[in-house]
Amino acid sequence: NSVEYALNKMNREVGDRDTLKKFIGPPLTESMEKYYGMSEEEALLGVKYYREYYAVKGIFENSVYEGLAETLEFLKNEGYILAVATSKPEEYAKRIADKFDFAKYFAGIYGATMDGSLIRKADVIRYALDNLGVERENYDQVVMVGDRNNDIYGAKENGIQVIGVLYGYGDLAELQSAGADYIAKM
């Protein structure tokens, strides 16, 4: 809905829902440039409009995958240190985690900056690892879980293993071609 709102404000044809689903995961500017042929300047304006809607309504137009709360609770109780590394702006990610009462499971919630200085998934992952105090020699003890190719690429760029999950927005072909170490489905 947020992308549709932005495109309408820019007098752009929205197209089909399948194209809009591709926006989930990668940085918004990249998706606007790639799928709607926008210039960098137009994409930045699109992000501005996207956030007008998202900050008020879109942020809460989501739902929790079945079994996620139980899985997070189990992993935390088993002693795993859990964190979020998302291309979504950090302040939005924290609000969503609070809404669903998930913040309690995470040692940290890390995301992109609103000013665009931190948006690449690999950089967000590195930012999270640095803030968690994880040294590079211990990256072999870290596993990223993600549902899109940018999650896989970001983990690989940091030298960490990654599990591609099929319950999100990516599909098997996308996760395999990106090089996921493991594939899981719920």
Question: What do these predicted ranges mean?
Answer:
Residues 143-184:
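Acidic, Mg2+-coordinating phosphoryl-transfer loop and its flanking beta/alpha structural elements
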Residues 3, 71-97:
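Substrate-recognition element of Asp-dependent hydrolases with the DxDx(T/V) motif
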Residues 6-7, 27-40, 96-99, 124, ...:
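Helix-loop "lid/cap" segments that line or gate small-molecule binding pockets
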Residues 121-152:
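Conserved Lys-Pro-Asp/Glu-containing loop-to-beta segment of HAD-superfamily phosphomonoesterases
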